[in-house]
A protein has these predicted regions:
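Conserved class I S-adenosyl-L-methionine
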Residues: 37-44
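Conserved SAM-binding loop
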Residues: 82-83
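SAM/dcSAM-binding transferase cores
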Residues: 197-241
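Conserved Class I SAM-dependent methyltransferase catalytic core
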Residues: 16, 20, 141-198
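Conserved SAM-binding motif I beta-strand of class I
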Residues: 68-73
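Glycine-rich SAM-binding Motif I of class I
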Residues: 48, 52
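Mobile active-site "lid"/loop adjacent to the S-adenosyl-L-methionine
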Residues: 118-146
């Protein structure tokens, strides 16, 4: 059995088409979760890693009554594996996993925070593994446009949407966000090394609020080693940090 060990929880990493990855961990660490948040949604939860990181972050604060972190996934195996990971974690009381596509998800609540690490290989050749294709190709499954449309109507007042995408999709993401009344408050561009262009972008949107976004950059590697900036971010999660 494939298990990824974090400092405070383990992730079964076998049945989900998309495995534990740096993108998801960074999204969970950087998403603007607040102690007052009660309803949190992870769209395309996969193994549940993002939701688990968020739960660990909340565990350092008094968790309010009624707090729920929900992870949804279109893939039955992924949702089942996330459910196992949630139930075996220290925060099983606030985590729940659902097998459902976003298009059919009709919750009876709004959300204070929505996060997603959606598929992003728009122009890639179709993956021969149908489940991985759904997990990785926007044409086959979940798209950030669908997420933006959902967030427009489902974010509570003051709610936030946080998405990680390849950096070359940032302009389109911001443009479509504006079309749905969502405006960026924070933009974090991620570089593998300083000399290269950013490879990923984490954008946080707020519903209805217009402001000049806070922009920052994270460099992961320098001279063959992890940067202090990166290690400082992941030190509570990865065993190597």
């Amino acid at each position: 059995m494939s298990i990824f060990h974090f400092k405070k929880f383990d992730v079964k990493n076998e049945r989900s088409a998309m495995k534990v990855n740096t993108d998801g961990v960074l999204l969970g660490i950087c998403a603007p979760i607040q102690p007052s948040d009660r309803q949190i949604l992870d769209i395309g939860t996969g193994t549940g890693t993002v939701a688990l990181v968020l739960a660990q972050r909340l565990s350092g604060t008094p968790i309010g009554e009624g707090t729920v972190i929900t992870g949804i996934d279109i893939d039955k195996d992924a949702a089942g594996e996330a459910d196992e990971n949630f139930r075996e974690s220290p925060w099983s009381g606030i985590l729940t996993a659902l097998h459902t596509p976003l298009s059919e998800y009709n919750p009876d609540c709004g959300f204070d925070l929505i996060v997603s690490n959606p598929p992003y290989y728009d122009d890639s050749l179709t993956n021969p593994d149908a489940r991985k294709a759904t997990a990785r190709h926007t044409g086959d499954g979940l798209s950030y446009r669908e997420i933006l449309a959902f967030a427009e109507t489902r974010l509570n007042t003051g709610g936030r949407l946080c998405i990680i995408l390849p950096a070359d999709q940032e302009k389109d993401l911001l443009r479509y966000g504006r079309m749905h009344g969502l405006h960026p408050s924070n933009i974090l561009r991620i570089k593998t090394v300083q000399r290269k262009a950013p490879s990923r972008t984490i954008v946080t949107f707020k519903s209805g609020e217009r402001a000049v976004p806070v922009e920052d950059c994270l460099v992961i590697m320098e001279k063959g080693s992890y940067t202090r900036q990166y290690l400082s971010l992941v030190k509570d999660y990865y065993l190597f940090a």
